[in-house]
């Protein structure tokens, strides 16, 4: 008998739920992150914030900016900077594709979540995104409210 492996849920360290409201999400990418030991330990506590973080190309490499990973309490003087730029590990073609979309099409590379994969490595889910206007946000909010009201009406009648 062969045993089936059940896929373990990914341990999400940080989630950018606001990005799906503020941006129209396009293609997504998975990237590795270069972290120090205290950053990894701090990420495992689940207190990181990526609400305002974005990725940008610099000298042919992708960097993650403005991601907040709090100091690890047990590290005392060997701690890391909380908002330092972190290098992202992507293939050259992916970096070129992201750079082209940012320069030519006016898109932004947004971090959607940071998680640990099956091997315990920290990964960032990036997305090519285009900013929404205020009226688009209001329209999305109205649609969401209507869907909720419709579900409530169907539940009460049925």
From Swiss-Prot:
GO cellular component: cytosol
InterPro entries: SmpB, SsrA-bd_prot, SsrA-bd_prot_CS
Keywords: Cytoplasm, RNA-binding
Example of a GO biological process term: trans-translation
Compartments it resides in: Cytoplasm
CDD domains: SmpB
Residue ranges, annotated region (Disordered): 131-158
Annotated Basic and acidic residues bias: 136-158
Main location class: cytoplasm
Keyword check for Hydrolase: no
Pfam families: SmpB
Family, per entry: Belongs to the SmpB family.
PANTHER family with a match to the protein in the record: SSRA-BINDING PROTEIN (PTHR30308:SF2), TMRNA-BINDING COMPONENT OF TRANS-TRANSLATION TAGGING COMPLEX (PTHR30308)
HAMAP family hit by this protein: SmpB (MF_00023)
General function of this protein: Required for rescue of stalled ribosomes mediated by trans-translation. Binds to transfer-messenger RNA (tmRNA), required for stable association of tmRNA with ribosomes. tmRNA and SmpB together mimic tRNA shape, replacing the anticodon stem-loop with SmpB. tmRNA is encoded by the ssrA gene; the 2 termini fold to resemble tRNA(Ala) and it encodes a 'tag peptide', a short internal open reading frame. During trans-translation Ala-aminoacylated tmRNA acts like a tRNA, entering the A-site of stalled ribosomes, displacing the stalled mRNA.
Protein name: SsrA-binding protein
């Amino acid at each position: 008998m062969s045993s089936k492996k059940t896929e373990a849920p990914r341990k999400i360290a940080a989630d950018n739920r606001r990005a799906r409201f503020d941006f129209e999400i396009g293609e997504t990418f998975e990237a590795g992150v270069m972290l120090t030991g205290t950053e990894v330990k701090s990420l495992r506590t689940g207190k990181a914030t990526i609400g305002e973080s974005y990725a940008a190309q610099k000298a042919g490499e992708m960097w993650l900016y403005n991601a907040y990973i709090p100091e690890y309490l047990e590290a005392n003087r060997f701690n890391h900077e909380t908002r330092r730029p972190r290098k992202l590990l992507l293939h050259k073609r992916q970096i070129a594709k992201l750079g082209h979309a940012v320069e030519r099409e006016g898109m932004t590379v947004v971090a959607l979540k940071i998680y640990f994969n099956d091997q315990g490595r920290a990964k960032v889910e990036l997305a090519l995104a285009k900013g929404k206007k205020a009226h688009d946000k209001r329209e999305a909010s109205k649609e969401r409210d209507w869907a909720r009201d419709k579900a409530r009406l169907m539940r009460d009648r049925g």
